[in-house]
Amino acid sequence: MVGVTPEPRTLAEKVWASHVVRSADGEPDLLFIDLHLLHEVTSPQAFDGLRLAGRRVRRTDLTIATEDHNTPTGYADPSYQSRRGDLLTITDPTSRTQIETLRRNCAEFGVRLHPLGDENQGIVHVIGPQLGLTQPGMTIVCGDSHTATHGAFGALAFGIGTSEVEHVLATQTLPQARPRTMAVNVVGDLAPGVTAKDLVLALIAQVGTGGGRGHVVEYRGEAIRKLSMEGRMTIANMSIEWGAKAGLIAPDDTTFGYLRGRPNAPAGADWEAAVAYWRTLPTDAGATFDSEVTLDASQITPFVTWGTNPGQGASLDASVPNPEEFATEPERAAARRALEYMDLAVGTPLRELTVDVVFVGSCTNGRIEDLRAAADVLRGRRVAPGVRMLVVPGSAAVRENAEAEGLDKVFTEAGAEWRFAGCSMCLGMNPDTLRPGQRAASTSNRNFEGRQGRGGRTHLVSPPVAAATAVTGRLAAPADL
């Protein structure tokens, strides 16, 4: 109607509204999906469902697959060509079957696949952005809980189950109930040496692992705006760790600079048109959220988890907490169990905790910026005796980039293992695992019991803290060296 001012909307509301195919009272909205990412673990049954129903993949052009979760990252022969199609290195029969099945399914249904040995193979949430597939204003799904990573670009991205994977393969749509919205207002600036990983761990410790449940979150504030795209992806990646369905950051010149010139990004006049549209996406002045959270970035110091969920964390300056000092009995009980599993004594300074393994990698912190940060700390130093350090790039392209910069030499000369791309020690689904009782400092996203191997004990940290820990053999920040 002429003269009517549109209702102010949030970023998430704009993206949602532009993708509604069908909406009816009392029913979920039917959303069009712009990009569907696949890997070997959650897709086999979905393809079986298509096969049984005699259906095809509706939009193969919007469907991309890669091999990442089960893939080994250590090879005797360092040549990429030796890895092309080579399943002999996958010794676990279940893992090998899943990889073989993904290859057959992609060949049968015409889905683009980046397998082991491919120059674009890697962790699904690393290759999407680096290939320019992830773009502002998109809807993106994957059968993986850390799909929220792509929200760093202003996309509505979330993980789905295997039955939903089949639905998207068959229809390129997905029924979804409209979620509530939440703003995370990050005030102040991060101090030098404090990273995006520290910020998001501090946030989860503040709000708890259920603080975002049922919400699509938007991260806002000057501290967020000052982050690189790699830092923003770290923040968005861990949205699920505090219960949020998705986590978005409004696109800006930093976003556009990252995307410009990437293989699948718009070019020429299409680029100008895309940027003009993307600039309309940020939340309107006057738009309201269902709830808001405030975090003071200036008060954050290097952070580490002490327990068995990402919310059980504290400043590296702190000591192991006393469970009896928590506010509620469920929190006290969870802390008691965590300390028992982690074999920690109340009051022990966190800096006194020794580690057996250090892992740098994952879809949280396996990008080139993360590897540079770790290398800056390790340069000219050695990994402590008795400590094993694995550095695993998030993609083959990240690995190639790092080697072009000489980072691989920094790592290997320090005594770390320089590996091939994959999910690696983030989860115990491939050969890179902890042994029972081993303690690790890890740049991944989850520290659940047994997450990195049965009986393994995980402390989540940033790449600089991981590198400093490798040098000292105990939890440490670079300033401690």
Swiss-Prot record:
Keywords: 4Fe-4S, Amino-acid biosynthesis, Branched-chain amino acid biosynthesis, Iron, Iron-sulfur, Leucine biosynthesis, Lyase, Metal-binding
Domain of life: Bacteria
Cofactor(s) needed: [4Fe-4S] cluster
PROSITE patterns found in the cross-reference section: ACONITASE_1, ACONITASE_2
Reactions accelerated catalytically: (2R,3S)-3-isopropylmalate = (2S)-2-isopropylmalate
GO terms for biological process, alphabetical: L-leucine biosynthetic process
Cleavable signal peptide: none
Gene Ontology MF, one: 4 iron, 4 sulfur cluster binding
Annotated positions binding [4Fe-4S] cluster: C363, C423, C426
Pathway note: Amino-acid biosynthesis; L-leucine biosynthesis; L-leucine from 3-methyl-2-oxobutanoate: step 2/4
PANTHER family: 3-ISOPROPYLMALATE DEHYDRATASE, HOMOACONITASE, MITOCHONDRIAL-RELATED
Function as written in the Swiss-Prot or TrEMBL entry: Catalyzes the isomerization between 2-isopropylmalate and 3-isopropylmalate, via the formation of 2-isopropylmaleate.
Family under the similarity heading: Belongs to the aconitase/IPM isomerase family. LeuC type 1 subfamily.
Protein name: 3-isopropylmalate dehydratase large subunit
Species the sequence originates in: Salinispora tropica (strain ATCC BAA-916 / DSM 44818 / JCM 13857 / NBRC 105044 / CNB-440)
GN (gene name): leuC
